[in-house]
């Protein structure tokens, strides 16, 4: 269960409806994907359509990374106050 707090579902291929069986991505994997997207967005030869698609993907990676970071913070806070029930 501890590992589940720090992983999100990897983005499934389009047209995939079952996300419960999707593999999980760690915070670091989200950040790495975001870094790669930023590098690719800096390519002057990137088309507008590809740039917009990449931007959407990057924003999703950022959102998921932030969610994992928030979960880690909440878990840390919970560990700092062990006398309170979760």
Swiss-Prot record:
Keywords from the UniProt entry: Cytoplasm, Exonuclease, Hydrolase, Nuclease
Lineage: Bacteria, Pseudomonadati, Campylobacterota, Epsilonproteobacteria, Campylobacterales
GO terms assigned for molecular function: exodeoxyribonuclease VII activity
Localization in the cell: Cytoplasm
EC numbers: 3.1.11.6
Annotated InterPro entries: Exonuc_VII_S, Exonuc_VII_ssu_sf
CC per GO annotation: cytoplasm; exodeoxyribonuclease VII complex
Listed GO biological process terms: DNA catabolic process
Full protein name: Exodeoxyribonuclease 7 small subunit
Family (UniProt): Belongs to the XseB family.
Reactions catalysed: Exonucleolytic cleavage in either 5'- to 3'- or 3'- to 5'-direction to yield nucleoside 5'-phosphates
A Pfam family the protein falls into: Exonuc_VII_S
Described purpose of this protein according to its UniProt entry: Bidirectionally degrades single-stranded DNA into large acid-insoluble oligonucleotides, which are then degraded further into small acid-soluble oligonucleotides.
The keyword Transmembrane helix appears for this protein: no
Residue ranges, annotated region (Disordered): 1-26
HAMAP family hit by this protein: Exonuc_7_S (MF_00337)
Assembly description: Heterooligomer composed of large and small subunits.
